Amino acid sequence: MELPNMNILSITPIYIAILGILFVPFTMRVGLYRVKNKIDLGDGNDDTLFKLNRGQGNFVETVPLAVVLLLLMELLGAGTTWLHTLGALLVGGRVLHYVGITGVGPGIGRPVGMFATFGVYAVASFWILLDVLG
Protein backbone atom coordinates (compact mmCIF):
# COMPACT_ATOMS: atom_id res chain seq x y z
CA MET A 1 0.00 0.00 0.00
CA GLU A 2 1.38 3.37 -1.00
CA LEU A 3 1.19 6.16 1.56
CA PRO A 4 -0.14 9.55 0.48
CA ASN A 5 2.35 12.35 -0.08
CA MET A 6 2.50 14.16 3.25
CA ASN A 7 4.73 17.01 2.10
CA ILE A 8 3.04 20.18 3.25
CA LEU A 9 5.85 22.44 2.10
CA SER A 10 6.33 22.66 -1.64
CA ILE A 11 7.54 26.20 -2.41
CA THR A 12 9.80 27.47 0.36
CA PRO A 13 12.13 24.44 0.09
CA ILE A 14 12.87 25.47 -3.51
CA TYR A 15 14.20 28.83 -2.36
CA ILE A 16 16.03 27.34 0.61
CA ALA A 17 17.78 24.93 -1.78
CA ILE A 18 18.71 27.75 -4.18
CA LEU A 19 20.08 29.80 -1.28
CA GLY A 20 22.02 26.77 -0.04
CA ILE A 21 23.56 26.33 -3.47
CA LEU A 22 24.52 30.02 -3.58
CA PHE A 23 26.12 29.78 -0.16
CA VAL A 24 28.67 27.23 -1.39
CA PRO A 25 30.58 29.49 -3.82
CA PHE A 26 30.17 32.49 -1.51
CA THR A 27 31.95 30.53 1.22
CA MET A 28 34.45 28.81 -1.08
CA ARG A 29 35.65 32.16 -2.43
CA VAL A 30 36.65 33.15 1.11
CA GLY A 31 38.52 29.90 1.74
CA LEU A 32 40.28 29.85 -1.60
CA TYR A 33 41.34 33.48 -1.21
CA ARG A 34 42.70 32.72 2.27
CA VAL A 35 44.75 29.78 0.98
CA LYS A 36 46.06 31.68 -2.05
CA ASN A 37 47.11 34.69 0.05
CA LYS A 38 48.16 32.72 3.17
CA ILE A 39 45.75 34.53 5.50
CA ASP A 40 44.67 32.09 8.20
CA LEU A 41 42.47 34.14 10.56
CA GLY A 42 40.90 37.56 10.32
CA ASP A 43 41.28 39.55 7.14
CA GLY A 44 44.98 40.42 7.39
CA ASN A 45 44.06 44.02 6.53
CA ASP A 46 43.31 42.75 3.03
CA ASP A 47 40.45 44.76 1.51
CA THR A 48 39.41 41.99 -0.88
CA LEU A 49 39.23 39.39 1.89
CA PHE A 50 37.31 41.84 4.06
CA LYS A 51 34.72 42.27 1.28
CA LEU A 52 34.49 38.52 0.65
CA ASN A 53 34.04 37.91 4.39
CA ARG A 54 31.29 40.52 4.60
CA GLY A 55 29.53 39.22 1.51
CA GLN A 56 29.42 35.72 2.94
CA GLY A 57 28.80 36.94 6.49
CA ASN A 58 25.91 39.18 5.55
CA PHE A 59 24.32 36.24 3.74
CA VAL A 60 24.60 34.18 6.94
CA GLU A 61 23.17 37.05 8.99
CA THR A 62 20.14 37.76 6.81
CA VAL A 63 18.98 34.54 5.14
CA PRO A 64 17.91 32.45 8.17
CA LEU A 65 15.23 34.87 9.44
CA ALA A 66 13.92 35.39 5.92
CA VAL A 67 13.48 31.67 5.25
CA VAL A 68 11.84 31.14 8.65
CA LEU A 69 9.33 33.85 7.75
CA LEU A 70 8.69 32.22 4.35
CA LEU A 71 8.27 28.82 6.00
CA LEU A 72 5.74 30.25 8.45
CA MET A 73 3.85 31.89 5.62
CA GLU A 74 3.67 28.61 3.74
CA LEU A 75 2.60 26.68 6.84
CA LEU A 76 -0.12 29.27 7.45
CA GLY A 77 -1.42 28.81 3.92
CA ALA A 78 0.01 31.74 1.96
CA GLY A 79 -0.70 31.59 -1.74
CA THR A 80 1.89 30.53 -4.27
CA THR A 81 2.15 34.04 -5.71
CA TRP A 82 3.15 35.49 -2.32
CA LEU A 83 5.69 32.75 -1.70
CA HIS A 84 7.27 32.78 -5.15
CA THR A 85 7.42 36.58 -5.22
CA LEU A 86 9.07 36.86 -1.82
CA GLY A 87 11.33 33.86 -2.46
CA ALA A 88 12.55 35.28 -5.76
CA LEU A 89 12.98 38.72 -4.19
CA LEU A 90 15.09 37.19 -1.42
CA VAL A 91 17.31 35.23 -3.82
CA GLY A 92 17.70 38.19 -6.17
CA GLY A 93 18.37 40.54 -3.29
CA ARG A 94 21.03 38.31 -1.80
CA VAL A 95 22.80 37.92 -5.16
CA LEU A 96 22.69 41.67 -5.81
CA HIS A 97 24.02 42.41 -2.33
CA TYR A 98 26.83 39.87 -2.66
CA VAL A 99 27.91 41.16 -6.07
CA GLY A 100 27.66 44.73 -4.82
CA ILE A 101 29.69 44.20 -1.67
CA THR A 102 32.39 41.99 -3.21
CA GLY A 103 32.82 44.07 -6.37
CA VAL A 104 35.19 46.91 -7.08
CA GLY A 105 34.01 50.37 -6.05
CA PRO A 106 30.56 51.44 -4.96
CA GLY A 107 27.75 49.66 -6.70
CA ILE A 108 23.98 49.79 -6.61
CA GLY A 109 23.73 46.05 -5.89
CA ARG A 110 24.51 46.32 -2.21
CA PRO A 111 21.79 48.82 -1.21
CA VAL A 112 19.24 47.35 -3.64
CA GLY A 113 19.96 43.87 -2.27
CA MET A 114 19.49 44.98 1.33
CA PHE A 115 16.32 46.88 0.43
CA ALA A 116 14.97 43.71 -1.21
CA THR A 117 15.82 41.64 1.86
CA PHE A 118 14.25 44.18 4.21
CA GLY A 119 11.20 44.14 1.94
CA VAL A 120 10.91 40.38 2.38
CA TYR A 121 11.22 40.78 6.16
CA ALA A 122 8.55 43.48 6.30
CA VAL A 123 6.01 41.96 3.91
CA ALA A 124 6.31 38.45 5.34
CA SER A 125 6.13 39.71 8.94
CA PHE A 126 3.02 41.79 8.28
CA TRP A 127 1.41 38.96 6.31
CA ILE A 128 1.99 36.58 9.26
CA LEU A 129 0.64 39.07 11.81
CA LEU A 130 -2.46 39.77 9.73
CA ASP A 131 -3.08 36.07 9.25
CA VAL A 132 -2.57 35.12 12.90
CA LEU A 133 -4.32 38.10 14.47
CA GLY A 134 -7.09 38.05 11.92
Identify the meaning behind each predicted range.
Residues 28-54:
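Cytosolic, membrane-interface loops and tails of multi-pass inner-membrane proteins
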Residues 15, 53-56, 86-89, 113-116:
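Physicochemical signature of membrane-embedded alpha-helices that form the seven-helix bundle of GPCRs
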Residues 7-37:
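N-terminal signal-anchor transmembrane alpha helix
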Residues 96-120:
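Interfacial loop-to-transmembrane junctions
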Residues 66-102:
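Mid-chain, well-packed structural core segment of small domains
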Residues 47-50, 112-126:
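Small-residue-rich segments of transmembrane alpha-helices in multi-pass membrane proteins
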Residues 126-134:
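Juxtamembrane boundary at the C-terminal end of a transmembrane helix
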